[in-house]
């Protein structure tokens, strides 16, 4: 939004052209989102407490979690507000990739908000019925996937690139739509499954989102992409602003979500952030690298799939409890130890993922 204003003012007053620089707008984006989440955080927490929007805790989970009962939830609303506001202010809103990611963020946020509202306010333990949640996730996911496919301007935009190799790629064609759909919906639910401990989901989200911002900057630059032998996707660099806003909003939220948490993000935050990460990974053509960097989200999801599958087939459970973080809690690990070790794993995976850009 302010990019347009700067362009207009540049014709009358010199100096406003500086706002064309992507790096400056990314810095302003992260500072704006961080400032909003830090300043509004106490007010949001106070309002959630006044409205008695508190988290309900399962009786069959780790006993240490019972003390979390009543902790304000739906704090993801603060994250999304900060991200969207910063992006609207500092990103180029004529960029189709920015619009696609904003659409995913807002629509999946609404799905999560309805789910949280039914659970917490209406006291419906099931929240939004699973079939309707999946229906709306699928509808929104396919809308974006189809839109990106039909507006693709170069073959690179629908090609799957294999890391570690310079010239190994697969032109997906119409399968691009289904891959994009799976990335959006799959990681939306993966982040949601991971969001079970204080700060466990938001910090990996910030780290992976920041790494995607670096990749978006490189992929959107013809010189860097040619030098690194990676795909060049014109316009994708603008997503750096969104990724910066995500990092700022996430860090601001972590200030209040770190152990012991004063607020939880709820489905409104987890579903939206996971979907946003998924669609950004698709746009910058680094789906496989994204899988590597998002190893914690993948492991948490796989643990649930294995647990459910094993119980249905054999009547036995592989883990003491799924998702995986609960397994370690029931083994006697203190919650902060689980959280920090999962963060450390994410740091390693993100660094390895970024290293693949050069290892060709």
Curated annotation (Swiss-Prot):
Cofactor: Mg(2+)
Pfam families: Glycos_transf_4, MraY_sig1
One cellular component (GO) term of this entry: plasma membrane
Domain of life per record: Bacteria
Membrane topology category: Multi-pass membrane protein
One MF annotation (Gene Ontology) recorded for this entry: phospho-N-acetylmuramoyl-pentapeptide-transferase activity
Biological processes, Gene Ontology terms: cell division; cell wall organization; peptidoglycan biosynthetic process; regulation of cell shape
Key words of the record: Cell cycle, Cell division, Cell inner membrane, Cell membrane, Cell shape, Cell wall biogenesis/degradation, Magnesium, Membrane, Metal-binding, Peptidoglycan synthesis, Transferase, Transmembrane, Transmembrane helix
Catalysed reactions, semicolon-separated: UDP-N-acetyl-alpha-D-muramoyl-L-alanyl-gamma-D-glutamyl-meso-2,6-diaminopimeloyl-D-alanyl-D-alanine + di-trans,octa-cis-undecaprenyl phosphate = di-trans,octa-cis-undecaprenyl diphospho-N-acetyl-alpha-D-muramoyl-L-alanyl-D-glutamyl-meso-2,6-diaminopimeloyl-D-alanyl-D-alanine + UMP
Intracellular or extracellular location(s): Cell inner membrane
Enzyme nomenclature, EC number: 2.7.8.13
Keyword Transmembrane (UniProt): yes
Transmembrane segments: 25-45, 73-93, 97-117, 132-152, 168-188, 199-219, 236-256, 263-283, 288-308, 339-359
Disulfides per UniProt: none
Enzyme class of the recorded protein, top EC level: transferase
Biological pathway: Cell wall biogenesis; peptidoglycan biosynthesis
Function according to Swiss-Prot or TrEMBL: Catalyzes the initial step of the lipid cycle reactions in the biosynthesis of the cell wall peptidoglycan: transfers peptidoglycan precursor phospho-MurNAc-pentapeptide from UDP-MurNAc-pentapeptide onto the lipid carrier undecaprenyl phosphate, yielding undecaprenyl-pyrophosphoryl-MurNAc-pentapeptide, known as lipid I.
Annotated family: Belongs to the glycosyltransferase 4 family. MraY subfamily.
PANTHER family per UniProt: PHOSPHO-N-ACETYLMURAMOYL-PENTAPEPTIDE-TRANSFERASE, PHOSPHO-N-ACETYLMURAMOYL-PENTAPEPTIDE-TRANSFERASE HOMOLOG
Protein name from the UniProt record: Phospho-N-acetylmuramoyl-pentapeptide-transferase
The organism's taxonomic lineage, starting at the top: Bacteria, Pseudomonadati, Pseudomonadota, Gammaproteobacteria, Cellvibrionales
Recorded name of the encoding gene: mraY
């Amino acid at each position: 939004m302010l990019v347009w204003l700067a362009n207009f003012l540049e014709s009358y007053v010199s100096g406003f052209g500086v706002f064309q620089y992507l790096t400056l707008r990314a810095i302003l984006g992260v500072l704006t989102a961080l400032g909003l989440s830090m300043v509004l955080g106490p007010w949001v927490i106070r309002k959630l407490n006044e409205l008695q929007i508190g988290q309900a805790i399962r009786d069959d989970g780790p006993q240490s979690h019972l003390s979390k009962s009543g902790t304000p939830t739906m704090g993801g609303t603060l994250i999304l507000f900060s991200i969207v506001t910063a992006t609207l202010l500092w990103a180029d809103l004529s960029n189709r990739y920015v619009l696609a990611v904003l659409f995913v963020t807002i629509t999946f946020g609404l799905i999560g908000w309805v789910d949280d509202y039914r659970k917490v306010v209406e006291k419906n333990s099931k929240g939004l019925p699973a079939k309707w949640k999946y229906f709306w996730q699928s509808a929104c996911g396919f809308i974006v996937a189809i839109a990106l496919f039909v507006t693709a301007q170069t073959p690179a935009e629908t090609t799957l690139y294999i890391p570690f190799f310079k010239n190994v790629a697969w032109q997906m064609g119409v399968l691009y739509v289904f891959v994009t759909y799976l990335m959006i919906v799959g990681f939306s639910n993966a982040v949601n499954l991971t969001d079970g401990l204080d700060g466990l989901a938001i910090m990996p989200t910030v780290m992976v989102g920041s790494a995607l911002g670096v990749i978006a900057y490189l992929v959107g630059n013809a010189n860097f992409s040619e030098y690194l032998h990676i795909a060049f996707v014109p316009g994708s660099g603008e997503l750096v602003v969104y990724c910066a806003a995500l990092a700022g909003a996430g860090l601001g939220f972590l200030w209040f979500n770190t152990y012991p948490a004063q607020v939880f993000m709820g489905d409104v935050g987890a579903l939206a952030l996971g979907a946003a990460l998924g669609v950004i990974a698709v746009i910058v053509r680094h789906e496989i690298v994204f899988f590597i960097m998002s190893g914690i989200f993948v492991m948490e999801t796989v643990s649930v799939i294995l647990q459910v599958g094993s119980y249905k087939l054999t009547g036995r459970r592989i883990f003491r409890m799924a998702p995986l973080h609960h397994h370690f809690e029931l083994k006697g690990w203190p919650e902060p130890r689980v959280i920090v070790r999962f963060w450390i794993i994410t740091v390693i995976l993100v660094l390895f993922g970024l290293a693949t850009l050069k290892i060709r």
